[in-house]
Structures are given as C-alpha cells and as structure tokens.
Swiss-Prot record:
Record text on subunit structure and interactions: Monomer.
SUPFAM superfamilies per the UniProt record, alphabetical: An anticodon-binding domain of class I aminoacyl-tRNA synthetases, Nucleotidylyl transferase
Organism: Yersinia enterocolitica serotype O:8 / biotype 1B (strain NCTC 13174 / 8081)
Protein name according to UniProt: Glutamate--tRNA ligase
Coiled coil (residue ranges): none
Family: Belongs to the class-I aminoacyl-tRNA synthetase family. Glutamate--tRNA ligase type 1 subfamily.
Cofactor dependence: Zn(2+)
Length: 471
C-alpha cells in the first residue's frame, strides 16, 4: 500500500507551531515510507479565510522545507464535487433535508441543556413524510447510524470508541447551498486517497462522524493519529499570551529552520535520549508509536539552545544565507566589509539567534556615532593613549593584511611596552568596535579592515584628548 498523508490547515491565521508540528509529523511519516504528501487548504470558512493567511502558510512550509507532492488543493474550488456527492446521498437516502428553523433548534438546545442532556438534533425531519415548498429554506443532514458504535485504532492513542447514540445527524450542506467542513474533509480524503490522517487531538470528536460518512459512501477509511496539544510553560494551552506566534515570526526572530524542525520533532516524539536530529535522521527514525499521548510544554530556552547549536554546526555558508536576510531587515549595507560567512565564524559562539548576530555585526560595516559609555569610561582613559598610538603605528605598517600579522602587531605592542595583552587589547577593542565585547582582537581588527581600524583608533585618541581637556 502506498502511504499518502495530508496537511490541511484552515487559512484563518498564520501557520502556528502546533500546525507546523502536525505538518512535520505527517511529512516525516510519509517520507519514512516513501509515500506522498498532500497540501490542502481548507478554506470553507469564507468569512475568516484570507489570502494573507494562505500566503503565510505557504511561506512557513517553504521556509521549513516541508515540500509537498500534490497541491495545494483549495476546498472552495471543489464545491461542485461536494454538492454532487450530497445530491447522490439524498437520492440513496443516506442524507435528508431538514427544514427546522433556527428558532426551533435554539429552543431544542436550550431545553436539552436545562434537562442536563447533551445538545443534539432530535431527528424530527429524519423520517418525516411532510411536504415543504420548493423555496422553503433547508439544510441537508447526514443520516447517522442510530445503533452500534464507531471504533477506530488511533495510531498514537490506541482504540477509541464512540456510541452512535452520542452522534447527531450532522449538517453537511447549509441553507445557502455551501457544504460544511466535516463533509468536505471526508470527500477530500476519499478523492485524494489519503491513507493516514495525522492531526491535532482537537479533531478526535470529528473522527467518528467522518468515519460514518465514509462508510455510507462506500469509501475506504484511513488510519487516524491524533497529536496532543502544546502547552505553555504555565501548563495551559499555548496561545498568543505565551508569545505563541506564526512560524515566520521565528524566522524574523533569528531562528534557523533546522533548529525549529529539530525542536518541534522532539516536542512529543523521542528516540532514546538523543536531542539533535538532522532531517535525514528524523526521516529515518520517525514512527507514530513513539509519539507521546501526553501534552508537551514549549520551552523557548531549549529552542535557543538548539538554535545556537545549529548556528555553529551547519556549514557557515548555509547559515550566512539566512543571516543575509536579517542584515537586510536592519538596513545594513554589507558591500564594504567582510563576507557574511566570516561573520558567522566570528560571532557564532556568542549568539543564540541570527537576529542577535545581525545586530552585533554592525561595527564591521558601519561607523558608530559614539562609544559605549561604560566601556569608554573604563578603557579609553589617558593611560590608554600610549598603547593605542603604538598599536596604530604597527597596524599601519602592515603590508600584508592577515590575521597573523594583526596578531603579531598587537602582541608586539604589548611586549614592547612591557604590559599584558589586556592593556593593549581592551582599549583597542573599544576603539574599533565601540563596545567592550567582541571576538578576539586579531580576527576582529582583521575583519574590520586596515583603513577603517586606523580611522577608528584616531577617533578614540580624539575622544581621550577631549576627556583630558574636560578634567
């Protein structure tokens, strides 16, 4: 049997982390078995569905490199197919027209709740022989079995059973002629030959209804797997108040797609004590029976740890591609400065996100207006004039601008003055970067460049002179 799964988001908002994890699990399951992965946009909610949300879903999938073999399919383009199936069901008696008014249904619901009963349709029109006018508004309901039960073996949770007495006759077409979500899903899964439905646990109650419709249509019933929800660090369902945002916000915040994928796969799935997984490893090892039934808590610190790992373990050229987007957002012109690959090598150990890296690399490309106040107060004092002038002379004398020669100039200055490297390195660091922290001075000064470094040392010496004049 060829495995075929689908990811079927509703375009009413951004692709959030829960949806991204569901997409990842479906994608991994399919790729593990060499099957096919379908992208389907369930846009039947015409009032809430937006093109912006569709674009955000597509952007998120592409950024995460979760490619699809079919689609994207749009339910709004398949209404003729859904209605043709409904008409066929009306003919063979597996569906019927319901003329109950909204007022009657509201009264029924209120009475049932008052009596402590579960609100459900009472079947008044199910076997009614009453005649109604052709123009009288009606919906179409599925004639759900009234006896027996629906049992399915959830691939994550095990056997789940629903009594048919608990399921009412689902509306499958509204009064305006549009098919409903639960029905469209069934026809899509049937037509697209979906073998495994992997989705969030909030869909468990939809499953018995969908299975009954599939059986009424004589369609094969796929396997189902329902993934547990993601919680915030307070134990409550992850939401916007926890900072939960669309997947692309993680891109904007400087996370690598490899880090987010690694984090999401471990958010409910495990393989021993292993924490780091390449996409190839995930694909090889992923199984549904290793997915936990329990909810998982989102931990931003863990994601940052993984991101730091990938910043420093992926090829610098690959990381630099993502960094280039970050520096563009900050308006940094990198044409006059080191290649971004060098920035990744220089700042990788110091940064948890690429946004942090982009913000930290400005001094390699742009002049700064002022020195960090604390760093200047501590290191750009009159006593720093001699080492700065001496190291400037040695840097200016370099004819072949290499990291080794820069290092020798700094070390040579310290040796000649008979002081520790810090007495030269710290004033030099503040002079050329404007701050008190940076990578090693030899690699930093080399990356900034000879002319720019000398100019900044002059600026620092002028700052010291102004400071002396004010004392």
């Amino acid at each position: 049997m060829k495995i075929k799964t689908r990811f079927a988001p509703s375009p009413t908002g951004y692709l959030h982390v829960g949806g991204a994890r569901t997409a990842l699990y479906s994608w991994l399951f399919t790729r593990h078995f060499g099957g096919e992965f379908v992208l389907r946009i369930e846009d039947t909610d015409l009032e809430r569905s937006t093109q912006e949300a569709i674009d955000a879903i597509m952007d998120g999938m592409n950024w995460l490199n979760l490619d699809w073999d079919e689609g994207p399919y749009f339910q709004t383009k398949r209404f003729d197919r859904y209605n043709a199936v409904i008409d066929q069901m009306l003919e063979n008696g597996t569906a019927y027209r319901c003329y109950c008014s909204k007022e009657r249904l509201d009264e029924l619901r209120e009475a049932q709740m008052t009596n402590g009963e579960k609100p459900r349709y009472d079947g008044r029109c199910r076997d009614s022989q009453c005649t109604h006018g052709a123009d009288e508004p009606s919906v179409v309901r599925f004639r759900n079995p009234q006896a027996g039960s629906v049992i399915f073996n959830d691939k994550i949770r095990g056997p789940i059973e629903f009594s048919n007495q608990e399921l009412d006759d689902l509306i499958i077409r509204r009064t305006d002629g549009s098919p409903t979500y639960n029905f469209c899903v069934v026809v899509d899964d049937w037509d697209m030959e979906i073998t495994h439905v992997i989705r969030g646990e909030d869909h468990i109650n939809n499953t018995p209804r969908q299975i009954n419709i599939l059986k009424a249509l004589g369609a094969p019933v796929p396997e189902y797997a329902h993934v547990s929800m993601i919680l915030g660090d307070d134990g409550k369902k992850l939401s916007k108040r926890h900072g939960a945002v669309g997947v692309m916000q993680y891109r904007d915040d400087g996370y690598l797609p490899e880090a987010l994928l690694n984090y999401l796969v471990r958010l409910g799935w495990s393989h021993g004590d292993q924490e780091i997984f390449s996409v190839a490893e995930m694909t090889e090892l992923f199984t549904l029976d290793a997915v936990s039934k329990s909810a998982s808590a989102f931990n931003t610190e863990k994601l940052q740890w993984l991101n730091h790992h990938y910043i420093n373990s992926l090829p610098p050229e690959q990381v630099a591609v993502h960094l280039s987007w970050q520096v563009e957002q900050l308006g940094i012109d990198t044409r006059n400065g080191p290649e971004l690959v060098e920035i990744v090598k220089l700042l990788g150990e110091r940064c948890k996100t690429l946004k942090e890296m982009a913000e930290s690399c400005r001094y390699f490309y742009e002049e700064f207006d002022e020195f960090d106040a604390d760093a200047a107060k501590k290191h750009l004092r009159p006593v720093a004039r001699q080492p700065l002038e001496a190291v400037k002379a040695k840097l200016a004398a370099i004819t072949e601008w290499t990291t080794e020669n820069v290092h020798n100039a700094i070390q040579g200055t310290a040796d000649e003055l008979g002081v520790g490297m810090g007495k030269v390195g710290m004033p030099l660091r503040v002079a050329v970067t404007g701050a008190g922290q940076s990578p090693g001075m030899d690699v930093t000064v080399h990356a900034i460049g000879q002319a720019r470094s000398l100019s900044r040392i002059d600026k620092a010496l002028a700052f010291i002179s102004e400071r002396e004049a004010q004392q």
